[in-house]
Amino acid sequence: MKKLSILVPYYNEGEEVIRTLLDSIAIQQNIDFNDIEVIICKDGDEGPELTQEFLDSYPYEIQYHREPKGGVSRMRNKAFEYSQGEYVMWCDDDDQFYHCLALWLIFRETNTPMQVQINGVTQTVNGFDVLKSVFLEEGRNPETGETYFIDRKDGFQFVHGSVYKRKLIVDNDIHFFDDCYIHEDNVLFAEASACTTQIKWCPQPFYLWKWRDNSVCRRSPTYIKETYTDLIKSTDRLIEWFKAKSKFDKARECVVRIVYDCYYNVMCHPTWEEIGTKEYRKKAEKRFSDFYKKYKDLWLECPDQVKMQIGNGIRQMVVQMGMLQEKVTLDDFLNRMENLK
């Protein structure tokens, strides 16, 4: 068995784009390349193929699988099925590892101890079920084109810079949802964290979320507004997963989080009133209305203390952005959503 499987969905980006990721693996130091494998799943027939000559030029095992068109989530799931590593991580083909000791750092953390709560008792365990890290995000100033970098310390919704133990994934049927193509990766850590307390935090970044002009989530300044319905969709799938696992507390928390997010970030956010985004708001409210009607019972069942904690956290983030504009109460908003046709 390999120590680590690096799982990469590939669409039509070409060798010049994916080369940066594969090169960043090839320069890794203090590791045995026999301990790793890279699994690339090509999503459909569109775009250039990766040649065998190109793949063979790297000093580690690369598997290249051509799959019927299915979207990024299905490719990530298929790559996992092909993999054999004790640990796995998903990388985008246009990203890269940040430095030459990234994999050494990951391997080191698989053996170092940490204290966790198991059945209410503090115990010391070696390794981890999940490793989450700070990762770097590369950005561009829209006016000057200047490059800047952000430390993503709160990016738990992203799959970037995360490593998972295979046994955890398999034993708990943790997976991406095939029909989710946008905001699809926010479900994985939510599923995993509901199944284990052996989660380790790495404050040292080893992954770089690179800027690419053609990236689907970078090319539009109104991306979140355009895709808010997809965020609700992926959360809907996650709630059903929690319910199937009898993790009803987690399901309730998911409902509460979307209720407050939609209230503060859609209803109370002044930019959603702009002429260019009114249509997005209309679609978001209709999708949320359906969501709320479906899960109203879970909202009502959730303890007020939990609601307050989640709501205050989301409200504080909006306040810090200077975008809070509470024109209606939460109750009035929910009543309108319940009656929306």
Task: Describe the residue ranges of each PLM region.
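Nucleotide-sugar donor-binding/catalytic module of glycosyltransferases
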Residues: M1-K233, K341
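Solvent-exposed amphipathic alpha-helical surface segments
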Residues: Q28, D32, W241-K245, L298
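Compositionally biased, low-structure terminal segments
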Residues: N34, L55, R108, K243, ...
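Solvent-exposed aromatic/hydrophobic patches embedded in short alpha-helical segments
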Residues: V163-Y164, I258-Y264
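Residues within HEAT/ARM-like alpha-solenoid scaffolds
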Residues: K250-I258
